[in-house]
Amino acid sequence: MTIWKKVFTLEQLNEMGKDCAIGHLGIEISAYGENWIEAKMPVDHRTTQPFGLLHGGVSVALAETIGSLAGFLSIEEGQIALGLDINANHLRPVKQGFVTAKATPIALSQNTHVWQIDIRDEQDKLCCVSRLTLYIKHL
């Protein structure tokens, strides 16, 4: 059974982010299932630090992007998801290619969501783990 409360297509989701940080970083929503959603991002001049490695802050931006989107898609109309906390552990460097972030729920309640975001490289090696907590505000 799906957790998604909104009807969407990947094209619609990618259109939403094209003129903001999501688009500038090259983040693309790439796949979803009944209780997970993924985004991919290039490791290139936009996303690396001066030593040519994926910037840790950009990994966190990717995690917050896909986790916040997951929260938005899994709440009812008349609610908004607001970030309360995010943390990340950077496990291995990435020099090139793409990384993929997959968000899955840890806990979904009426007022709080906790999402696990795993970021993997093209060899499916875990590069970063992140946890995002969202406050669900009822309008």
Where are these regions (language model features)?
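Terminal targeting signals and extreme-terminal segments of soluble enzymes
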Residues: 1-139
